[in-house]
Amino acid sequence: RIGGTIDRMDSKEGTLRIVDYKTGGSPKVPANIEQLFTPAEGRPNYIFQTFLYAAIMARQQALKVAPSLLYIHRAASESYSPVIEIGEARKPKLPVDDFSVYEDEFRERLLKLLEEIYDDKEEFTQTEDTKKCEYCDFKAMCKR
């Protein structure tokens, strides 16, 4: 079972904005959708989570969906924007103000990930970083 809670949704001018509040950390800019699925330190997990919410909501209603991350500690800055951006380093970034642009690629990659997770031929490997185990729901299952 996969679950989660969308912190806030609001609609304005034909767009449903999915807002995920963050109390720590800093905004990250993935180079592309694939980076959301590539295990690495500093991976933009928050964006993955918000895109997952956007993918669900995009199928449940007709409005354009715009996922966003609101970093509370940065919100007072006049230059801050909660809009998620995607783009290569040292190149112009593209705001994700319409999830449908990325939806097919995200869903395709998500399906591939789920197939890998549920493939009984795929061996489970524990992470080497035991700090990740502190809040993991499955630590008892893998004996950590």
Task: Label each region the model flagged.
Residues 1-144:
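RecB-family 4Fe-4S metal-dependent nuclease core
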